């Protein structure tokens, strides 16, 4: 089995690193395409021994499972470009927030009568094999196709199948969730520094507290509130701290953050449906930095195939 990534940004790097670390794929079985070869993530993939190319078509040609790992509003143009190269045996996995199975199928069916499409939402902790992934299968995807993706994603964390209408909410919760955790950790570390702790120690303590709390919850059958109550002694420091968080609307802020991410996910789908980004903008900018200043509706013509750039590790060479 070979895996390809259209896009060589943070998600592609995280998944490639996770797959190789888990031992489910060798680096030479992975290919990623990017119009820009100087990105830090591209350099990291190159060091891992992943095959790299500027041609999306080349990536399709060398893949069995194809991950669309680009921004949502770029997806329609990518599908126009690679549609003729997608074969009946390909499993096309959309990782873009808000991009529906039907929208991908509609594009591909102009070239292929029964494209096998799976919609997936994962997160960056896959890089350390602690990701959270859900997926939904499309009209023509077989049960075995879903099982193959689940096997891949389970090697880098938790993975389960859901109904597609739940995926936007998953995006707001676990898709964006690591960013919430990092922001909370940054604030906790600031609090530690304010009270006299060295920065490095404050970060380590905060990270371990979050890691330990998450593991306690996952390993138990208790509700989070029960575990929270177990930390609070009557009249103690923790209950006073929680009162302060409650008075600042801590819970409401998190609930609103999940909702805001979910709503934005649906807005991104609307943008993708309307194809608001011009091919000119697509060519001028990096995949993760498309300019939206002067959007126009037009059709992207397939680009000419680029040269496949490969890197092979010498015998006895170091692995990243």
UniProtKB/Swiss-Prot annotation:
EC number from the UniProt entry: 1.5.1.2
GO molecular function: pyrroline-5-carboxylate reductase activity
SUPFAM superfamilies xref list: 6-phosphogluconate dehydrogenase C-terminal domain-like (SSF48179), NAD(P)-binding Rossmann-fold domains (SSF51735)
One of the GO biological process terms: cellular response to oxidative stress
Recorded superkingdom: Eukaryota
Pfam families recorded: F420_oxidored, P5CR_dimer
UniProt pathway annotation: Amino-acid biosynthesis; L-proline biosynthesis; L-proline from L-glutamate 5-semialdehyde: step 1/1
Residues where L-proline binds: 164, 237-238
Any Gene Ontology CC annotation: mitochondrion
Biased composition (Low complexity): 296-305
Catalytic reaction(s) noted: L-proline + NADP(+) = (S)-1-pyrroline-5-carboxylate + NADPH + 2 H(+); L-proline + NAD(+) = (S)-1-pyrroline-5-carboxylate + NADH + 2 H(+)
Keyword set includes Glycoprotein: no
Quaternary structure (record): Homodecamer; composed of 5 homodimers. Interacts with LTO1.
Annotated function: Oxidoreductase that catalyzes the last step in proline biosynthesis, which corresponds to the reduction of pyrroline-5-carboxylate to L-proline using NAD(P)H. At physiologic concentrations, has higher specific activity in the presence of NADH. Involved in cellular response to oxidative stress. In some cell types, such as erythrocytes, its primary function may be the generation of NADP(+).
Record protein name field: Pyrroline-5-carboxylate reductase 2
Species of provenance: Pongo abelii (Sumatran orangutan)
Taxonomic lineage of the native organism: Eukaryota, Metazoa, Chordata, Craniata, Vertebrata
Gene: PYCR2
């Amino acid at each position: 089995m070979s895996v390809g990534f259209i896009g060589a940004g943070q998600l592609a790097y995280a998944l490639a690193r996770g797959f190789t670390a888990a031992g489910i794929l060798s680096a030479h079985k992975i290919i990623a395409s990017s119009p820009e070869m100087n990105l830090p993530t591209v350099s990291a993939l190159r060091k891992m021994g992943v095959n790299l190319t500027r041609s999306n078509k080349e990536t399709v040609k060398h893949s069995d499972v194809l991950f669309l790992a680009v921004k949502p509003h770029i997806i329609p143009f990518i599908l126009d470009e690679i549609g003729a190269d997608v074969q009946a045996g390909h499993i096309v996995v959309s990782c873009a927030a808000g991009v529906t199975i039907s929208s991908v199928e509609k594009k591909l069916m102009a070239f292929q009568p029964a494209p096998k499409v799976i919609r997936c939402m994962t997160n960056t902790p896959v890089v350390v094999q602690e990701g959270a992934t859900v997926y939904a299968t499309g009209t023509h995807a077989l049960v075995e196709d879903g099982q193959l993706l689940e096997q891949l994603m389970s090697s880098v964390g938790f993975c389960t199948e859901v109904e597609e209408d739940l995926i936007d909410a998953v995006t707001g919760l676990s898709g964006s969730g690591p960013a919430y955790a990092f922001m909370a950790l940054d604030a906790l570390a600031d609090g530690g520094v304010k009270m006299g702790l060295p920065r490095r120690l404050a970060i380590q303590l905060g990270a371990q507290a979050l890691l330990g709390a998450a593991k306690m919850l996952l390993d138990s059958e208790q509700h989070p509130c029960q575990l929270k109550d177990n930390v609070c002694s009557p009249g103690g420091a923790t209950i006073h701290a929680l009162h302060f968080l409650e008075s600042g609307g801590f819970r409401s802020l998190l609930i609103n953050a999940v909702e805001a991410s979910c709503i934005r996910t649906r807005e991104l789908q609307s943008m993708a449906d309307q194809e608001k980004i011009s091919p000119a903008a697509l060519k001028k900018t990096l995949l993760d930095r498309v300019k939206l200043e002067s959007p126009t509706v037009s059709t992207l013509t397939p680009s000419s195939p680029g040269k496949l750039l490969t890197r092979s590790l010498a015998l006895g060479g170091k692995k990243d």
